[in-house]
Amino acid sequence: MRLWFCLSFFIVLCLEHFPGTLADERNNRDYTIRTRLHGHHKPSRNNRYAIKTSIHGHHIPRNVPESEEKTEQFLRDLPKINRKGPRPPGFSPFRGKFHSQSLRQIPGLGPLRG
């Protein structure tokens, strides 16, 4: 019983000590953020909605209507992009043992002639 208590106490102590575990989750407003470039820092409480990028640091999003228009235009063009072009007769997307058979069925593609 003592061994079980000591083991569980040690596990809880380790979880409390290391960052990114119970201690930080309990104090969520002080939760540290790990980044590759800057190490540990606490998120600032500004209302400007800064976006963190890995190269340039913090940026305020600009031209949001323009990006929304581009997104809407892309969504309008998506059916045209996805429309498949004409396929040659006998074309098969399959590979493996059936691929050579589908190539033989294409007229004009016989065995290689030297």
UniProtKB/Swiss-Prot annotation:
GO terms for biological process: defense response; vasodilation. Expressed by the skin glands. GO terms for molecular function: hormone activity; toxin activity. GO terms for cellular component: extracellular region. Its main location: secreted. Keywords: Amidation, Amphibian defense peptide, Bradykinin receptor impairing toxin, G-protein coupled receptor impairing toxin, Repeat, Secreted, Signal, Toxin, Vasoactive, Vasodilator. The modification Arginine amide is found at R113. Residues 35-114 are annotated as: Disordered. Disulfide bonds: none annotated. Residues 65-80 have a biased composition (Basic and acidic residues). Residues 1-23 form the signal peptide. Residues 35-45 have a biased composition (Basic residues). InterPro entries: Bradykinin (IPR009608). Potent vasodilator. Binds B1 (BDKRB1) and B2 (BDKRB2) bradykinin receptors. Belongs to the bradykinin-related peptide family. This is Kininogen-2.
